[in-house]
Amino acid sequence: MNMFSSCMITALVILTLPIIMSSTKLYKNKLYPYYVKTATSYAFMISMIPTMMFIYSGQETIFSNWHWMTIQTMKLSMSFKLNYFSMIFVPVALFVTWSIMEFSMWYMHSDPYINRFFKYLLLFLITMMVLVTANNMFQLFIGWEGVGIMSFLLIGWWYGRTDANTAALQAVLYNRIGDVGFIMTMAWFLLNLNTWDLQQIFITTNDNFNLPLLGLLLAATGKSAQFGLHPWLPSAMEGPTPVSALLHSSTMVVAGVFLLIRFHPLMEHNQTIQTLTLCLGAITTLFTAICALTQNDIKEIVSFSTSSQLGLMMVTIGINQPYLAFLHICTHAFCKAMLFMCSGSVIHSLNDEQDIRKMGGLFKVLPFTTTSLIIGSLALTGMPFLTGFYSKDLIIESANTSNTNAWALLITLVATSLTAAYSTRIMFFALLGQPRFSPMILINENNPLLINSIKRLLIGSVFAGYIISHSITPTTIPQMTMPHYLKMTALAVTILGFILALELNLTTQGLKFNYPSNYFKFSSLLGYYPTIMHRLTPKTSLTISQKSASMLLDSIWLENILPKSISYFQMKSSTLISNQKGLIKLYFLSFMLTMILSLLILNYHE
């Protein structure tokens, strides 16, 4: 057992070596990215030892060996929880990151600050490892905030671009909203249970956990880009493609779902929170799938697809299947990271062109990338015996056989069908058909850094689902029995999506709209959500502020109180006081009459 924990710690410590190295002269070395990639690959290989031990023994462990501080009666110590979730997630994250780092060496080779880029990627990976192995909420919060700040730095990597800066700020602001929920939960546990240790929280028999669980759901909504706090994820595509592949597909965005999986002992008997999670996930998965249908930017489509899959994971947690949600996290990481890397390969080859309308015919010039992209898309849609099938098929079956909300189930099935539709659209427009890009572009994918990294994830996208689902069973799962039509639902829905997408792609190629349809506008403008939230709300508040500040105060009160009131009172008083009308003849006549009368009176008086 000592070997189990020490191997795991060794794997995590190896990752910190290049960070320490960055304070020496080696940081200026051109080989620094290579050191980082090698450290990650060694960490992955060493982390496989405890994972294999765990698979065969099934023994979870917690070790707490560094007392940090005591707050009144609560002891804060650094403790790691190596259970099913962290033991499987760590090797998956390390494997995906290793491939992405190798890909980055090709993609970012001309960047002058490539060493800093690799250091950021590694720091992100370390904070992610802290998050998944944490045994108390404080340590989990450190990892949670760590991935948030690294996300900000990496999205805004090209800080000379306004869009990148805006997207980075947007990601931070949306995540702050989620963090409010996390901090509220931490405060509740501190006040009511006087502990942040996960074991102590789980063994308490407090019936009313609604408030902290709502806080956790808000935190997960922010981090995992669920409906309401979702716009930051598509905007995050402004970052370099390796960042999109690592943070916004396989690791960081699943942190919110991972948080709910960690706290599932509190959620499993709470009907209210489960229903909320189910409905939120169902709305997200459908809404983002609809948005993905009409996008033209290849990275935007893949990012909306990520958001849709996160919604599906939330649905799985909502039907009380945390282990299944976790399996989907692991299988999704492989195919989604590969999809982003293939997109990056296409974008780089076409001189940074991201519009799928300006691609086409790439299967002839980029055969390896095309093959990988098609296999990744099929794995994502749940093609039988590829990675995605093992989790996605089970999720649909579990939803079909559980006493769930019929509305949520229906829209989840529709979203699953749409997954096939937008995946077909990418394949159809970007890879097949006639070339629509400039013939002057030189295309070359024969770089070992690119080929090897995608190849590893390609193998993962084919076999990982089978390996993870068959060699690692959390508990003895009883064999499910269900009618044939229910068993085939997931597959039927996916095939329906494929057929519809192909039919629509082929029939609408020559069609031209005289005016855009409202449905099309709804999808391409992302359901008007950014327009309303990012434009209408600030504009309304600014207009009201301006009206109250300038119109109400300046134009009305200040003018009326001082200049206008003074002149008004002056005019009134002068009008009242002076009866001078300027009639000289009349005044002279009255003066003469008065004089004559007075003289006459004086004369007669004598």
Curated annotation (Swiss-Prot):
<keyword id="KW-0812">Transmembrane</keyword>
<feature type="transmembrane region" description="Helical">
    <location>
        <begin position="457"/>
        <end position="477"/>
    </location>
</feature>
<comment type="function">
    <text>Core subunit of the mitochondrial membrane respiratory chain NADH dehydrogenase (Complex I) which catalyzes electron transfer from NADH through the respiratory chain, using ubiquinone as an electron acceptor. Essential for the catalytic activity and assembly of complex I.</text>
</comment>
<feature type="transmembrane region" description="Helical">
    <location>
        <begin position="1"/>
        <end position="21"/>
    </location>
</feature>
<keyword id="KW-1133">Transmembrane helix</keyword>
<keyword id="KW-0813">Transport</keyword>
<dbReference type="InterPro" id="IPR003945">
    <property type="entry name" value="NU5C-like"/>
</dbReference>
<keyword id="KW-0520">NAD</keyword>
<feature type="transmembrane region" description="Helical">
    <location>
        <begin position="310"/>
        <end position="330"/>
    </location>
</feature>
<comment type="subunit">
    <text>Core subunit of respiratory chain NADH dehydrogenase (Complex I) which is composed of 45 different subunits.</text>
</comment>
<dbReference type="GO" id="GO:0032981">
    <property type="term" value="P:mitochondrial respiratory chain complex I assembly"/>
</dbReference>
<feature type="transmembrane region" description="Helical">
    <location>
        <begin position="171"/>
        <end position="191"/>
    </location>
</feature>
<comment type="similarity">
    <text>Belongs to the complex I subunit 5 family.</text>
</comment>
<feature type="transmembrane region" description="Helical">
    <location>
        <begin position="117"/>
        <end position="137"/>
    </location>
</feature>
<dbReference type="InterPro" id="IPR001516">
    <property type="entry name" value="Proton_antipo_N"/>
</dbReference>
<keyword id="KW-0999">Mitochondrion inner membrane</keyword>
<dbReference type="Pfam" id="PF06455">
    <property type="entry name" value="NADH5_C"/>
</dbReference>
<dbReference type="InterPro" id="IPR018393">
    <property type="entry name" value="NADHpl_OxRdtase_5_subgr"/>
</dbReference>
<feature type="transmembrane region" description="Helical">
    <location>
        <begin position="273"/>
        <end position="293"/>
    </location>
</feature>
<dbReference type="Pfam" id="PF00361">
    <property type="entry name" value="Proton_antipo_M"/>
</dbReference>
<feature type="transmembrane region" description="Helical">
    <location>
        <begin position="488"/>
        <end position="508"/>
    </location>
</feature>
<dbReference type="GO" id="GO:0005743">
    <property type="term" value="C:mitochondrial inner membrane"/>
</dbReference>
<feature type="transmembrane region" description="Helical">
    <location>
        <begin position="365"/>
        <end position="385"/>
    </location>
</feature>
<protein>
    <recommendedName>
        <fullName>NADH-ubiquinone oxidoreductase chain 5</fullName>
        <ecNumber>7.1.1.2</ecNumber>
    </recommendedName>
</protein>
<dbReference type="InterPro" id="IPR010934">
    <property type="entry name" value="NADH_DH_su5_C"/>
</dbReference>
<keyword id="KW-0679">Respiratory chain</keyword>
<keyword id="KW-0472">Membrane</keyword>
<dbReference type="GO" id="GO:0006120">
    <property type="term" value="P:mitochondrial electron transport, NADH to ubiquinone"/>
</dbReference>
<feature type="transmembrane region" description="Helical">
    <location>
        <begin position="140"/>
        <end position="160"/>
    </location>
</feature>
<dbReference type="GO" id="GO:0015990">
    <property type="term" value="P:electron transport coupled proton transport"/>
</dbReference>
<dbReference type="InterPro" id="IPR001750">
    <property type="entry name" value="ND/Mrp_TM"/>
</dbReference>
<dbReference type="GO" id="GO:0008137">
    <property type="term" value="F:NADH dehydrogenase (ubiquinone) activity"/>
</dbReference>
<feature type="transmembrane region" description="Helical">
    <location>
        <begin position="43"/>
        <end position="63"/>
    </location>
</feature>
<dbReference type="Pfam" id="PF00662">
    <property type="entry name" value="Proton_antipo_N"/>
</dbReference>
<keyword id="KW-0830">Ubiquinone</keyword>
<feature type="transmembrane region" description="Helical">
    <location>
        <begin position="241"/>
        <end position="261"/>
    </location>
</feature>
<dbReference type="GO" id="GO:0045271">
    <property type="term" value="C:respiratory chain complex I"/>
</dbReference>
<keyword id="KW-1278">Translocase</keyword>
<keyword id="KW-0249">Electron transport</keyword>
<feature type="transmembrane region" description="Helical">
    <location>
        <begin position="409"/>
        <end position="429"/>
    </location>
</feature>
<feature type="transmembrane region" description="Helical">
    <location>
        <begin position="582"/>
        <end position="602"/>
    </location>
</feature>
<feature type="transmembrane region" description="Helical">
    <location>
        <begin position="201"/>
        <end position="221"/>
    </location>
</feature>
